[in-house]
Amino acid sequence: MRVLLASDDSGSLKEIIFNRGTNTSIKTALQPFHIDIHLNQGLSNRIDKIYHVSDSLLLLARHSGSLELVSSKRVSKDVDETNEPKYDVTEFELQDLISGLFDQSVLDTLSSKSKKKSKIEDQFVELYLIKKSAKNPIFLAATKSGNVTIIEVDLHSTKISKIASHKIKAPVEFVTLYDLDKSDKFVMAYGGEENLVRLIELSSDFKEISDIWAAKNVPFDNIGLRVPAWDVALRFLESEKNGVYNFITITKYAQLRKYSTNAEDCRPVKSITLLPKGEQLNSCKIIGDTSPLGNFQSSNFDELEFLAADSRKDVYQFNGKGRLLRKIAKGDITGFASCIAVTDKYLLQGGLDRYVRIFDLADYKLLAKIFTGGKVSDIILLEDNDLELPLTEKQLKMKKKKEAKRSIVEADEDAENEDLWNKLESKKRKVSKNDI
């Protein structure tokens, strides 16, 4: 298996090559074949997001407000063939960058008006493909300060250019694109702390952006107090009616909210408390039948299942009715799971405890656990095949014994076959003489 991850402490990209069963917390377990650091720029310039553009290109969104286009090239690793498997490693090189995509002043203004003491720090919250192209794919990058930047990547010249930029209301936790139909429309939803969900439409040339719908908060609670609004993640569902958008949000306060833009009052059609003890959630990843951007390919809220991480150390699996199905790796994760990523087969998890873990989505069995030396902000899986390991001395001896035993058995079988053949030939000759 091969993963790339963003390591905060060194501000680097790390490549790890390993097999299933790898566990660096157990000395006698299988260990990684390769861990290497690339493009390290320190904590203040750490990587917020990674996007795998092609087999030879990556986009990196850095905490300094820059987007980097990085080329990758596989080269053979020099190994002792008697002790290690053969594999290639990756070399990375910066090709182009765009900087100045943050607006810290917006967040400083919000912080000055807030009762909270902590400063809100700008960062990239989204980086994804919005328009495919064999030559010039288009990407969206969004920041907590509300900057939405549309980027074009020239695959031939390995250059990136900014083709449009827009401002939306801050602070922003997510900007989710609706990708469940083949429409030319670019409909997106965004929201954040005291920033209720809004749906916006981006024009086909990416130059104009317009509001099309805005959510209202849930009613006051049973003692007449306003309920805080802080959606941290949103995923769309399919719609059975043209122009109507259905979606779920996860709130910081561990609520699952179901919305339909067809609802008359623009409030959630349902709100469910997921965790009863005041745990705070930070993410939502739908598992099962999803679009390339992780939206749910069904219109039935009750059919979905999703993963969510809290702000302490737990990762949970829930169904669409808000029922807790399981805790993932209960007791093993010891720090905030700052990153969870889902593929069609695997759950990738990393965080404050500096480990990256790979789970099988079929049964949530831990496949690998690797200490990375830094807080993990993003992970992508490049390969899921295992390397063929050279045989140990004990295995070689066993193999030779089996081969020797097989040779003896084959020799005995050949002798028996020869004897049987001779008997048959002798019988044929006797029959022929009698016929004469």
Curated annotation (Swiss-Prot):
What are the subcellular locations of this protein? Nucleus, Nucleolus
So which residues are the signal peptide here? none
Q: Does the keyword rRNA processing apply?
A: yes
Q: Does the keyword Aminoacyl-tRNA synthetase apply?
A: no
Q: What InterPro entries does the database record attribute to this sequence?
A: WD40_repeat_dom_sf (IPR036322), WDR74/Nsa1 (IPR037379)
- What cellular component terms from Gene Ontology apply here? nucleolus; preribosome, large subunit precursor
Please name the GO terms of the biological process aspect recorded for this protein, alphabetically: ribosomal large subunit biogenesis; rRNA processing
SUPFAM superfamilies attached here? WD40 repeat-like
Q: What is its main location?
A: nucleus
Keywords of the record: Nucleus, Ribosome biogenesis, rRNA processing
Protein role:
Involved in the biogenesis of the 60S ribosomal subunit.
Subunit architecture: Component of the pre-66S ribosomal particle.
Tell me its family. Answer: Belongs to the NSA1 family.
Q: What name does the UniProt record give this protein?
A: Ribosome biogenesis protein NSA1
Source species: Kluyveromyces lactis (strain ATCC 8585 / CBS 2359 / DSM 70799 / NBRC 1267 / NRRL Y-1140 / WM37) (Yeast)
Taxonomic classification: Eukaryota, Fungi, Dikarya, Ascomycota, Saccharomycotina
